Each structure stands twice: as C-alpha cells, then as structure tokens.
Amino acid sequence: MSIKEDKWIRKMALAHGMIEPFADGQVNLNPETGEKLISYGLSSYGYDLRLSREFKVFTNVYNSLVDPKRFTEDTFISITDDVCIIPPNSFALAHSVEYFRIPRNVLTMCIGKSTYARCGLIVNVTPFEPEWEGYVTIEISNTTPLPAKIYANEGIAQVLFFEADEICEVSYAERKGKYQKQQGITVPFV
C-alpha cells in the first residue's frame, strides 16, 4: 500500500468526483473578509476536509447510559451555526462539507488537525473503505475542563489516501455497508 500524492488526489477529484466540492490547494484565508481560517483543501499527501454548519452536541438530559446498540437522536441537541460550543468533557458530531467517493483500490485514514489537537480537541473518523461514498460523520471530543469552540466551513481533519497493491474481493458498497451514501450527520445504529 502506498500513500497518494497531491497530483493523484487532484486528478481523482476533478476527473472522477472523488471529493466534491474540491479546493485545489490549502485555503487559510477567507477570500471575502481576509480573516485567517483553520486551513482546508489539498495538501502534499492528503486533503483537509471541512465541517459543515450542522452539529449535534451530546446531552445527558434524556439518558443515563450510552449504548451503541440502542442509540437515539434525543441523545443530542441539534445546532445549525457558523460555530459550535462543545461543553467540557463532552463531544459533538458533525459532517463534512465535502462528499467523498472512494475508489475500489483505495482506503483512507483521517487524522485530526493539530490546531484543534493542541487545544485538547480530539477528532475521530473511521477509515473510508473501498467504494464507500457519502458525507463524513465526524466526532469531536472536548477533553478539556472548559467549553471549546469549533468552526464551520474550516478545516477539521486530514484525509490520507492509500492505494492497495491488489483489488479487494468485496468492497464496502458490495457488502451493503450501513453507512453507504450517508447524508448529513449519521448517528450510530446496529
């Protein structure tokens, strides 16, 4: 397996719709206001994805136990805004601005941006499997004892693309993965 470079990512995004919308290069300034942004877009060996304006912030108002087999929407408060405040020692779900279509011979890994990590915010995204497509559901944990702010339409994590030496026998699409073509924020289900 080898990591893919910027030229390959650009070609796959523009010719095959692997990433839509696609920012060809690192964007770190708002083009309208000149304000500094947490960067997003194409980098040397990856692509920095952005958060959308939709968030689900964890609340324990209706639950006393988190059970991944019986998870309900009322576990979260829904927010649509340019920023989201995550309570201390809590977490939020969001989804990417970008829609991804992963080729059959590719697996991705997603790593949180250091800007957030250095503030005590941990980003978790599972791998995008061969032939998976959809908006990425992103989990952001606030490990600090203080409220933490995250920004919509700015970078949150870097996606690394790995090309396999051989094609897999069964892709995510073929095994009818439960998160295939997910739209918006998708909460866990079994």
Curated annotation (Swiss-Prot):
Q: What metabolic or biological pathway is this protein involved in?
A: Pyrimidine metabolism; dUMP biosynthesis; dUMP from dCTP (dUTP route): step 1/2
Entries under CDD domains matching the protein: trimeric_dUTPase
Top-tier EC class: hydrolase
Which EC number applies? 3.5.4.13
- Sites binding dCTP sit at 113-118, 158, 172, 181-182
Query: Where are the active-site residues found?
Result: 139
Among the record's GO biological process terms, what is one? dUTP biosynthetic process
Annotated coiled-coil segments of the chain: none
RNA-binding listed as a keyword: no
| Keywords of the record | Hydrolase, Nucleotide metabolism, Nucleotide-binding
Record GO terms (molecular function)? dCTP deaminase activity; nucleotide binding
Q: Which reaction does it catalyse?
A: dCTP + H2O + H(+) = dUTP + NH4(+)
Subunit details for this protein?
Answer: Homotrimer.
By its UniProt entry, which HAMAP family does this protein fall under? dCTP_deaminase
Sequence similarity:
Belongs to the dCTP deaminase family.
Q: What does this protein do?
A: Catalyzes the deamination of dCTP to dUTP.
**PANTHER family this protein is in?**
DCTP DEAMINASE (PTHR42680:SF3)
Q: What name has this protein been given in UniProt? A: dCTP deaminase
Gene this chain is encoded by? dcd
